[in-house]
Regions:
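C-terminal helix-cap and adjacent tail motif
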Residues: 6-10, 14, 88-89, 161-189
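A glycine-rich helix N-cap at a beta->alpha junction
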Residues: 68-77, 152-177
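Structural motif
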Residues: 99-101, 135, 160-162
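Glycine/small-residue-rich phosphate/adenosyl-binding loop
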Residues: 44-116
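N-terminal targeting/leader regions
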Residues: 1-21, 26-29, 33
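A generic structural signal for short coil/turn motifs at secondary-structure boundaries
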Residues: 17, 110-114, 174
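Glycine-rich phosphate/pyrophosphate-binding beta-alpha loops
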Residues: 38-42
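Small-aliphatic-rich amphipathic alpha-helix that forms the alpha element of a beta-alpha
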Residues: 34, 102, 106-152
C-alpha cells in the first residue's frame, strides 16, 4: 500500500485512457471517500453526477465547447488563444474520450461552495490514484447550460457544476513535472 507521501508524489493529471469500462462500484467507493473531505462548518454541500456513457460525454463536451466559444466571442471569458482553435475542432472532446466523468456540483447559495467542492475533488483524485486510476479536473467542461442537459445530470435550479473530473484506467503514467519549492512569504514567531 502506498504511503500518503507516495500518493502525493505519484498522482498525475491523466488525459489518455485505456478503452476499458470503469465499474460503477469503484466510482461509488471513490465518491464515498470524497465525502471525508473537510467543508466549511461541515456543511458538506457537494453533490455528484456520474456519466459513463460515451455518447453523453461527447454531447456534454459539445455543449461546453459551444458555450465557451460563445462567451469568448462576447468577451464574457478569457481563454488562452491556443484553446480557441482547439475548441472549434469538431473532433476535440474536452473530456478526452474518458470512459467516465464525475461532476462535483453544489448550491450557489453556499458561500464556500468552490472551496468545498475543490477539497472534495482533490479527495476524488487522490482516492482514484490510490487505486491506480487516472483523473483530470477539466475546467473547460463546466460550461453546461442547456436545461435538458442539466436535467439529465440531475442538476437542480440554483446549483452549478464546480469540478468536472474525468476518470479511468490510464494508458500510461507520465513522469512528474518539476515542482517549485514553496514560496513562504514570512514566518512570524
Amino acid at each position: 500500500m502506498m504511503t500518503f507521501t507516495e500518493l502525493l508524489k505519484n498522482r498525475r493529471a491523466i488525459r489518455d485512457f485505456q478503452d476499458k469500462e470503469l465499474p460503477l462500484k469503484i466510482v461509488e467507493e471513490i465518491l464515498q471517500e470524497s465525502t471525508l473531505a473537510p467543508s466549511a462548518s461541515n456543511g458538506q454541500p457537494c453533490r455528484f453526477s456520474i456519466v459513463n456513457c460515451k455518447d453523453t460525454i461527447k454531447a456534454l463536451s459539445d455543449e461546453s465547447k459551444e458555450n465557451l466559444l460563445d462567451d469568448y466571442a462576447k468577451n464574457k471569458t478569457s481563454l488562452n488563444p491556443g484553446y480557441v482553435d482547439v475548441l472549434k475542432d469538431k473532433n476535440f472532446n474536452v473530456f478526452y474520450n474518458a470512459p467516465c466523468l464525475i461532476f462535483v456540483i453544489g448550491s450557489t447559495a453556499v458561500h464556500s461552495l468552490e472551496l468545498d467542492c475543490a477539497l472534495a475533488a482533490s479527495y476524488i483524485m487522490f482516492s482514484a490514484a490510490s487505486r491506480g486510476l487516472g483523473t483530470c479536473w477539466i475546467a473547460l467542461g463546466a460550461y453546461i447550460r442547456d436545461p435538458q442537459m442539466k436535467a439529465l445530470l440531475g442538476i437542480p435550479d440554483g446549483c452549478e457544476i464546480v469540478a468536472p473530473i474525468i476518470i479511468g484506467y490510464p494508458k500510461e503514467i507520465p513522469a512528474a513535472s518539476e515542482r517549485h519549492a514553496p514560496q513562504i512569504l514570512r514566518v512570524i514567531s
